[in-house]
Structures are given as C-alpha cells and as structure tokens.
Amino acid sequence: MKVVETVARLEAFRRARAPVAGVEMGLVMTMGALHEGHRSLIARARRENTVLVVSIFVNPTQFGSSEDLSRYPRPLEADLELCRHEGVDLVFAPPESELYPLGSGTKVVPDPALTEVMCGLSRPGHFSGVATVVAKVMNLVQPVRAYFGQKDAQQVAVIKSVCCDLNIGGRIVVCPTVHDPDGLALSSRNVYLSSAQRSTALALPRALDKAAHLWAGGERQASELERAVRSVLASEPGLEIEYVAAVDPERLAPRQDNAGPVLVAAAVRVGSTRLIDNVVLGQHHERRPIIAIDGPAGAGKSTLARRLAQRLGFLYIDTGAMYRAVTWRAMQERIDPLDGERLSALTRAVRIRLAPGYQSAFPTRVWVDGEEVTRAVRDEAVSLHVSAVSSHPGVRSELVAQQRRIGEAGGVILDGRDIGTHVFSRAELKIYLTASVEERALRRADDLKAKGLPVPDIEVLKEQIRSRDNQDMSRAYAPLRKADDAIEVNTDTFTVQDTLDRLLALYRDKVGGSV
C-alpha cells in the first residue's frame, strides 16, 4: 500500500495506471478516525474496483466557527493499518497546505435549496466546504466510482448535485448506514459519548424505527412521521432536538401529494456531541438476478463468468480464489490439508479481500490478512491442495456464509462446484459448464504457460484433472453435481466468444434481462 501526501504523487499514481486496459479506480473519501462504517465502504469499493484510493483529510473548510476542528480525532497510524488490512492500494493523506495552497480561496457553492435546510440551518458554510473538497479530490483521482454512506444523506444529495452540475465524472455509490448492535449509527464522534450519554442517544434509532413502523402500517403524511419521531426524542431527558425532517430523498424538499419515497432524518445533541441518522421509506430496489455457474475444473467457468459479469454490469465473486486464499494461508502455517478442525478455525480467523484484476493472467487480485497474494494463490502447490482443503465442511460453511452476504442483494455472478446446488440454490439462472478431460488439460497447459509457470507433461495434467474431478464429486459435503434446473453447456468445440454469446442468449430467454 502506498501512502502519499502530495498532489503531484497522487497524480503520478493515477497517470501510471490510466493507460492500463481494464483499470477501474474507486475512491472512498474520509476524514480519518476510521470505524466499521468506513470499513464497510472500503470493503465494497475493494470488491468492485481494480484500484482503490482512500483519502484521509480533516477538511477545515467544512467546520463552523463554533465547531472545534482541533478536537477532531486523528489516529492516522490506526487508520493506515485498517486500510492496509482491507487491501487499499493508495492512501492520500495530504496536509492542509497541499489542498488549499492559497488558503480557502475558491469555493464551490451548491444549490441553496439543498444546503439551507436540515443540517445546513445550524452549520452555515458546511456544505460549501464539503462540495469544495469533494470536487478537488474527485478531479485529482478521477474515479470510476466514489463511495459515500447513507448516514450523511444530505451530504450525498449535495455531492450528487454538484457532480452533475459541474460534469465531474464517476458514479456516486451510496452504501447503507452501519449501526452498532445497540442500534446507534457508527460515527467518529461516538467516542465522545459517556456510557450514560450513549444510552440517551439510543432514542435516535428508536425514533426512526417508530417512523418505519408507521409507514409499514400505511401512514404517508410527512407531518405525522415527523411528529412521531419528535415524540420519541422529546421523551428522552438529556437529548436536545436540532431538527426532524421528512422530505424527498433527492431534492430534500416536501413531497408532492405524499407520493414516492421519503427520507426521515433527524439531528440531535447529547451533551456536546452532535449525532445524525436517517431512514429512507418506500424506496423499492428491484433485486437483479443471481447467476450460478458450476462445473469441473478447466471447463472455462471463471473466464466466462468474468466476461458475462462485464457484459451485464454484474459483480463477479471469485469463489475459487477464496478457497485458494485459505489453502495458501494453511500452507504458510503448515496445517495438514486433512486437519479439518484446524482448517475450519483458520477460515473463521482469516480475512480475505478480492478485487478485479487488470492482468489477463491474474484477473482477480487477492489479499489475505492485508497481504496481497495474487500470484501466490495461483501457485501449482496451492492448486494441488485446494480441493482437499475445500472439502472440509467447516471451511466451506464459513466461506459460503461470506459469499451469501456479498451476493444476497443480487446482480452477482459466481462460479464454482456447488453454487447452484448449495450456495445459491434459488439463483435465477444456473449454468453447468463442462468439457472433456483432454480439452481441459490443453487449457491448463496454456494457462500455466501464459503465467510463466512450469508446464507438466499433458498426460500428467490429465491425471491431475481426473483426480481433482474425483475429489470434487465424491466429497461428503456439497459435492460437484449438476443442479436439477441447471442448463448444461459443453465448451469443447466452442470459442470463448461463442460460449459467451450462448450464455447471454440464455440470460435473455430464462431471466428476461436486457444485454
């Protein structure tokens, strides 16, 4: 992971990657003091981009005169360690003079309709400061995607508007708010709360839950939703209400005829700590399909799954890389591939991160406990042991749980041995790819050669493939088999493009999706 403090070094990093085909850069902007909410943003950005930049900058222009800039926490070393562990490629942590070399000078002034309501009432100038720094960093990084949290709903609306009005490229991806188990939204400011104050602050999520309950019961009047939230908050001694609003999520204005979704948001103070949270009600997201591709090793699953994901705009989850990551770690710790108990414990403890690659020989980047092991997990020794390691129920159950968490929202493609039969048995489209042993051996030889690795005799490769097939099909837990509702596609005599065209046709016919 690189850490840079200057604009010149950041631009050099970006320019070095710009000419590389397939590079998609993601950006997560933060003010540091990173917590699990930030981690969730970074983790999603890591999955969806080939290169990930995180900025850490306590932006002085978004602090008001009554807000203590010097008091804001700055645990930089801990923040860098979290970024390193999550597989971040570059952290941009500039001093104030680097982003504001001539002082605060030029400013971006967003639409007052978005900034003179809600948080803007008590924080004049705040959103101009936010818009200015976002415009600066977005222009410097030029990301394909930039990730922001739903907790800062007004900030998200402002950023979307500014990026649209100023033609700043990159898609704004809004990620769900992360809450602690007690219900309080994660915030860097939570550290200021005493135990008693935290208990008081829990009235905020309770109040929003009340609004959600009323909505579920048919209430659509914004005034009634606001009244219910205020009632819960007002009943909590020691809590000061700053505002409660029920507005259009994009325009932050009253809804017309009570139609469409509503953003119910509130800001409160507990002691000297200001807290915000919100909930969007009535926003329907139609889940995109899940596509499961199963089959034996060497049938072309990974290549086709990646290309299909690119064509459809889906997220590709490289399940094989996850099992290889566990196998690599087990080999590092000299764990016997037959020791299911130790392997299961290892899988629960190890932290795996995946990202799209930008080299044809290594199309998935892999991190294990913060260390990039993209090449190491493709080593022949790992290939020989991965089937044995993945056969243990404890290993599979943990990785399957992770895969389900990533894919449950839909719009994903997974390939493996048991995706359609076990991981996502209700996937909307299931494909079973197969090919002869002879064809798969030839493909394996070509793959090894492309990676600059030793190529065994073709008969040795055939025997290895037969052995792997036998292991996969005879394991006790979730063995390789064709799902009853899967469509079998033999790839022996077809090019990758021919097979891809057939899969796209199946997607149109079976799911009704557009390509």
Curated annotation (Swiss-Prot):
Keywords: ATP-binding, Cytoplasm, Kinase, Ligase, Multifunctional enzyme, Nucleotide-binding, Pantothenate biosynthesis, Transferase. ATP binds at residues 31-38, 149-152, 178, 186-189. GO terms for biological process: nucleobase-containing small molecule interconversion; pantothenate biosynthetic process; pyrimidine nucleotide metabolic process. Its EC number is 6.3.2.1, 2.7.4.25. It is found in: Cytoplasm. It comes from the Bacteria. GO terms for cellular component: cytosol. It catalyses: (R)-pantoate + beta-alanine + ATP = (R)-pantothenate + AMP + diphosphate + H(+); CMP + ATP = CDP + ADP; dCMP + ATP = dCDP + ADP. Residues 1-279 are annotated as: Pantoate--beta-alanine ligase. Beta-alanine binds at residue 62. Pathway: Cofactor biosynthesis; (R)-pantothenate biosynthesis; (R)-pantothenate from (R)-pantoate and beta-alanine: step 1/1. The active site is at 38 (proton donor). InterPro entries: Cytidylate_kin, Cytidylate_kinase_dom, P-loop_NTPase, Pantoate_ligase, Pantoate_ligase/cytidylate_kin, Pantoate_ligase_C, Rossmann-like_a/b/a_fold. GO terms for molecular function: (d)CMP kinase activity; ATP binding; CMP kinase activity; dCMP kinase activity; pantoate-beta-alanine ligase activity. The keyword Amino-acid biosynthesis does not apply. (R)-pantoate binds at residues 62, 155. Pfam families: Cytidylate_kin, Pantoate_ligase. Residues 280-515 are annotated as: Cytidylate kinase. Its main location: cytoplasm. Catalyzes the condensation of pantoate with beta-alanine in an ATP-dependent reaction via a pantoyl-adenylate intermediate. In the N-terminal section; belongs to the pantothenate synthetase family. This is Bifunctional pantoate ligase/cytidylate kinase. It comes from Gloeobacter violaceus (strain ATCC 29082 / PCC 7421).
